[in-house]
Regions:
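Catalytic loop of short-chain dehydrogenase/reductase
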Residues: 149-171, 176-177, 181-184, 195-196, ...
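Substrate-binding pocket helix/loop in short-chain dehydrogenase/reductase
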Residues: 109-110, 114-122, 215
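Short C-terminal tail/terminal secondary-structure segment
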Residues: 2-7, 235, 246-293
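Conserved glycine-rich cofactor-binding loop
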Residues: 16, 23-25
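Alpha-helical segment proximal to the catalytic Tyr-Lys
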Residues: 138, 181-184, 243
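Short, small/polar-rich loop/turn modules that mediate ligand/substrate recognition or access, typified
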Residues: 99, 184-187, 245-247
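C-terminal substrate-recognition "lid" of short-chain dehydrogenase/reductases
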Residues: 93, 130, 223-252, 257
Length: 293
C-alpha cells in the first residue's frame, strides 16, 4: 500500500469546524480552506449578509449547499454564545474544531483611549474568545475532544498605537497556555500574525495607512504576509499533523521579531515567495504601491 501523506485530500472529512469572524478576511479564507479539505464549516459572525456571501461561495466551490451553515452571534454576549454553540451542535451533530478568529481594534495611543473604547476591544478580543472556547469545551469537547486555535498578533515587543489590542491579545496568549493544561487532552493553540495584507487595512485612517505603507521595510522576508499563509497555519494546528502540539503560539511574521539593529535588513532587493492560494481574497488598496516595488 503506498504511503499516504497526512496532508491529503479529505483531511477533515466527517469533521465540523466552527469559525468565528467567518464572513471576511482570515476567517473567510480559513473557512474556504477547511471546506476544501472536507470539513463542514459553521460560520459565526455578527453580520448575516457577509456570512451568507461566504456560505454561497463555499457551496459553489464544493458543489454542496450543506457544507457551510451560518450563525449570527455577538461573541461578547454570554447567553448568545451558549445558544449559538448549541445551535451549531444541533445542525452539525459535532464540533471537532474551533477557530477563534473574530476580533477588532482601532488605532489610538494609550492616552487617547477611553474606558469605553478599551472595554470594547477587550470584550471583542479576549472575552469573546473565552466565552466561545468555554462553551465549546463544556458542551462537547470535554467529552469528545477536539482542537481550538486562537488569534493573537505580534505582541511581544508591545503594540504602540494599539495598546488595547496588545493587552487583550496578551490575555489570549495566557488563556491559551492555561487552557492547554486545564482542558487537556483537548489541544489549545494560537496563531500570531505579523504584518498581513488583509483588506481590513483599508478601514484605518490616513496617518495609520501611511505608517503601514512604510513598515514592510522592517520585514526580513521583504513583503507583507497573506491571509492564505495565516489560514494555512490555522489549518495545520487543527490537523492531526499537530497532534502533539498544544499551548503554543505560532508566529507568522516573516522573522520580524528577530531583525536586529546591529544587523540591518538590506533585503538585497528580493522577497520571499508568497503563498496566496485564496483566489477570492481582497488585496488592500493601501498596499498597492508597496506591492509593485
Amino acid at each position: 500500500m503506498p504511503y499516504q501523506s497526512i496532508f491529503r485530500p479529505g483531511l477533515f472529512g466527517g469533521q465540523s469546524i466552527l469559525v468565528t469572524g467567518g464572513g471576511s478576511g482570515i476567517g473567510r479564507c480559513t473557512a474556504h480552506e477547511l471546506a476544501a479539505l472536507g470539513a463542514r464549516v459553521a460560520l459565526v459572525g455578527r453580520k448575516r449578509e457577509k456570512l451568507e456571501t461566504v456560505q454561497r461561495e463555499i457551496a459553489e466551490a464544493t458543489g454542496d449547499a450543506n457544507t457551510a451553515t451560518i450563525h449570527v452571534c455577538d461573541i461578547r454576549e454570554e447567553e448568545t454564545v451558549k445558544a449559538t454553540v448549541a445551535a451549531v451542535l444541533a445542525a452539525h451533530g459535532r464540533i471537532d474544531g474551533l477557530v477563534n478568529n473574530a476580533g477588532g481594534q482601532f488605532p489610538a495611543p494609550l492616552k487617547d483611549i477611553s474606558g469605553k473604547g478599551w472595554d470594547a476591544v477587550v470584550r471583542n478580543n479576549l472575552t469573546g474568545c473565552f466565552l466561545m472556547s468555554r462553551e465549546v469545551y463544556n458542551q462537547t469537547m470535554a467529552a469528545k475532544g477536539g482542537a481550538i486555535v486562537n488569534m493573537l498578533a505580534d505582541i511581544w515587543m508591545g503594540m504602540p498605537g494599539m495598546g488595547h489590542s496588545g493587552a487583550s491579545r496578551g490575555g489570549i496568549l495566557n488563556f491559551t497556555e492555561t487552557a492547554a493544561i486545564e482542558w487537556a487532552p483537548v489541544r489549545i493553540n494560537a496563531v500570531a500574525p505579523g504584518l498581513i495584507a488583509s483588506s481590513g487595512l483599508d478601514t484605518y485612517d490616513e496617518p495609520f495607512k501611511k505608517s503601514i505603507r512604510e513598515r514592510y521595510k522592517q520585514i526580513p522576508a521583504g513583503r507583507y504576509g497573506t491571509e492564505s499563509e495565516v489560514s494555512a497555519a490555522i489549518v495545520y494546528l487543527l490537523s492531526p499533523a499537530a497532534a502533539f502540539i498544544s499551548g503554543v503560539a505560532l508566529r507568522i511574521d516573516g522573522a520580524v521579531p528577530h531583525a536586529k539593529r546591529i544587523w540591518p535588513h538590506t533585503g538585497n532587493g528580493s522577497k520571499s515567495p508568497a503563498f496566496d492560494g485564496f483566489h477570492l481574497a481582497s488585496f488592500p488598496e493601501v498596499l498597492r504601491d508597496v506591492a509593485a516595488k
